[in-house]
Amino acid sequence: MEIEFIQNLEKFCIGLQSNKSNERETSEQSILTLMKTPQPYKLCFNLLSKSNLTIAHFYGLLMIRDSAIREWAALDSQTKIMIIETLFQYIENMNSMNFLNYATKGQSFNTLGVIIKRSWLDNEKYEIGKGQMELNQIVMDRVYQYIDSGSPDRIEISIKIIGSLIIEFSSSSKAAHIQLSWEFHQKCLITFQNLHLQPIFRKVLELLQQFKDHIQQVPSRLTDQSFLQILYTSVKVFTDILDWRFLESGSSVLAYITSFSGGRTNLKPTIEWISLFTPSQSGGGISPIVSLVFGLYQLVEKVEKIPNLLRHAMSQLCGLQGPIIKDQKIKNQYLSEVLTFTNKLIEKSITTRNWNEMEDISNIIYKFCNTYKFSGIACLPNQIVIPFLQYTTQFVLSSLNLMKIWAKHGEEELEEEFENDCFDILLRSFVSLISDAEMLINRKRVDQLENFKEQYQVLKQCTSQIYQNYIQSRLELSEIEINKSNEELEPTCKSRGGIGGAEDEIDEDKKKYDEQLRSVAYIGRLNPGQSLELLKNEINRVINSLKERVSDPILFESLHWLLIFAGHLIFDAENKTPSAIPNAIEDYTFEQCKLTPASQVDGVIDLCNAVFRFHMEYENPLLNNGKMDTISPLVSQTSLWFTSGWSLVYLLPSSVFNVQISPKIIEAYGTEQPLLSITDYFINKILLNLKCWSGDLDVLKATSNLLNSFTLNKELCKYLIRSPNWSRLFFLEGISLLPPSVYGQLFKAFSRVVFSFPLSTRREYFIQLVKTLVEQMDGVLGRADFTKISQEAKIKENIYILLEKLNGIVSVSESEYVDDEDDCLFLTVDLFTKYATSLIAMIPLYDHCNDIVLLILRLFSNFTKHQLEYLNQDRARSIFPLIIQLFNSVATTSSHKKTLDSKEYYHRVRMMVKILTNIITFGDQRNNCPTIISETIFHAINIITPCLSNNDLLLYPKLARNYFMITSFLFGADNIQVKNIPVINTIYSLIEAGILHHDLEIVKSCFECIGCLTKSLENSKEKSGGLVDPHYQSVLIQFIGSVINFLLLQDFNVDELLSVASETLFSLMYSSPDGYRSKVIELITRQDPSIQSRVVQQFETLTIIGTDRKSKDLFMKNLQNFLVNVKSLINKK
């Protein structure tokens, strides 16, 4: 039988390497069958002693491992010790087996490591010498003997065994799944950590110290490949131990589980490790680990692979936390030593061109700065901290130079990768230091730090260098890009700054460098005066040069970036509504106002004036002379983006947002006469842009966005309408046809202005706003032959424009401009209602024109989002039936349109779901029309559910989340009988599928649906005197099974989903205890008989003792423990 087993396995292994797919598949299935052989240990060890086929050895070792995992509890003591002893012998003899490859050798250590862990908690005693020992003691004694043997071969074996044990006992992502409880894994980790991790680490540390001494004495050892291999293996084990997630002895199982959530964590050894990490007086005040890592690195930094591991170790040492450095004196000593070594490392790396090295050092710097921040280093001597700041600054500047070198040599991908992986991290390092330093200043803790003043001053000097060099480097990089483009493109479209530039480039630049720009702006604000002056001078220089060298693409590109830098410096670019002045800028301008003469212009005002010179001195004169081809659309967009952001922060600045506004800023941007001049100028600017940039949609969008930014400030609207040119803009006098989307944005802004008028005149101005619109709508829709002429190009163009204008008007909520419901005139509601039916009737006519259909849907979406707040019952009765008409029209038209693109169909359905989401979330606080709303949702969900389920649209997470939110609302409605929903069975199926979705929010939404359903059932039971509808009873039992299966058979995010899953299971068990018991029995009967009693005992801990919050919290706690004890036992097949 043994010979036949060897022959068969070898034959199947050879078959795996066949060129014929059917032979490979047959061989794979045959090996899988062999792998299920009960207790194959003697067969496998016989194969390992006789076969010369490396792949056969690989699968033999794998079979030993998997069988031992599966059968360990049933094996007798002699078999267990035989397996481990024979594996040790096999590993010792591997060097004589020249045919073994790297993977097979690695599998031998993996097999031994996994079996050692599986046997770790065994209690059997074995006769060893004169005493008795447990199996784990026997194993570890053997490992210690190997590492102390002095034999290079045995030392290497011990290191590799230790490496395998670290992987398995740390439960890393590479660890084998041995199908035991979390409690078992936790006990293994803590006992291994407490008994062996530190002794092993000390021996590895001692071994590495010996290697270091050998290298110093005999440098030629670095050319010995055998020596380098064992050195690499030892350093790898060393770094793996530094990655260990330490647990205190009394830690709960839940603490063990949650320690693996998230990414890589900081090094946090227990207090017992203090002598290894902190400086000792006997060792000359030097930490053994720190001195070894940095000292060994200096010797091997030219060797392959090993330096990378040591730099990772440095990163871990630069993030050391926990009880061993809790004492401030010890912490300061440790940080001083680490920083001393790190300074030498950074200084030496300033001139490096090694990408991997720079990435690692960037991470080391970031780890140190982000962990200890400025408060950590401010306690250290200046002679250590100041060089660190200066060397790190030089490293950043060197990185900028390296990026330029790569860009010049055509290695743009390498430059971009470096920016993403290294440079952003370096900038965030300084952001961490600055934010912490500012916090110390704000909390008045500076006096407690002896060296804060000097170090903070150096930090300011360093960040000033970084900001200035970053600005210059970004301009140089853009120039390099332009020059390369000029070599490839025709003269008419040489730069993206010219007419031939790509669309949306300003957004592309801001998104691509978003993280960088925010970090750089934060750094620049530490020296606001210098940063403002730098940008002002650069912008003035470029504009002066532009006036001399009109249309110069490099100047356009430079100005584009300078405007972006200016915007990020003086306001937060993500602002979409009126916002505060950034604190650093506000404080600086306020203080400067007190220190400088009244005649001296504020730095922010100076910078803004420089930016506005582009409009006034360059762009506007050329536009007035019809020379659009000499202006960069990109720079025009960027200048408008800057002006929009500036207006939200500085124009009529709010004392609500800002504590101390500079009087000079108030005088320039917050008093009547300047405001009238500013608003009049920009109204003229908007008119000029609308007139002259009619061929560039992006500039027109940026122009209309500027007007919207102005109108977001209700107080500023009063100044807009006082402009002599307001009526020209309001009635678009002298403006030729604009793109439809621009009309939408303009009418949105006009509506805000109209609603800012007093109630007495609001209706009059609203009528003026919509007069032309109404005439055109009536003129088009009122024609008897509209159906006949509807497909004419001119008619369709008019329809686009009218729908965009309506969307703009409907997007402004009248309720924001009134204090009370009684003051609402419902001007927009009445306008919408007048044309809603006609617009719905247009959908079949324009079914082939998806843009028009989507515009109509967007109109209804905007209406339901912005116009429902004060809706009374009478108006609701006339409006909500229109929603059902709309849905029926879209669903009927779309369903039979076979040529409709799936993307177009998705967008239509998405808009319908959005409309329903708006309806259920607008918040009917006055309870004006709850019945009408729930009835609308009832009818609408029957229309959209087939649209979703028949087209797999629930694969789209956002769409699915909103759909289940709507379903929860419907399930919770008092006047709706869930079982009467025609598509209810489809909804149930979708909920069950949603529970297994990869998106956390979808899973939560599905649990909430089930929760709402159980509440609905409880309400119906109360109304019916305790009677349970059979429909609901069967559905609840079905969902009980689904929730139990989710908890036990699915891997899920405990932090995010356990609470809502517990709440759902609690309500299901309370509503249907018999159904819960039936599902538990069904699950248990599917399990192996050997574990059934254990599972039953655990299920008995899940009981409900009450329905209050305390009882639910206790239930969730019991559920946590239940999952810890049961989940790993359950058969998932």
Curated annotation (Swiss-Prot):
Mediates the nuclear export of proteins (cargos). In the nucleus binds cooperatively to its cargo and to the GTPase Ran in its active GTP-bound form. Docking of this trimeric complex to the nuclear pore complex (NPC) is mediated through binding to nucleoporins. Upon transit of a nuclear export complex into the cytoplasm, disassembling of the complex and hydrolysis of Ran-GTP to Ran-GDP cause release of the cargo from the export receptor. Xpo4 then return to the nuclear compartment and mediate another round of transport. The gene is xpo4. Its main location: cytoplasm. GO terms for biological process: protein export from nucleus. One of its GO terms (molecular function) is nuclear export signal receptor activity. Belongs to the exportin family. GO terms for cellular component: cytoplasm; nuclear pore. Interacts with Ran and cargo proteins in a GTP-dependent manner. This is Exportin-4. It is found in: Cytoplasm; Nucleus. It comes from the Eukaryota. Keywords: Cytoplasm, Nucleus, Protein transport, Transport. InterPro entries: ARM-like, ARM-type_fold, XPO4/7-like.
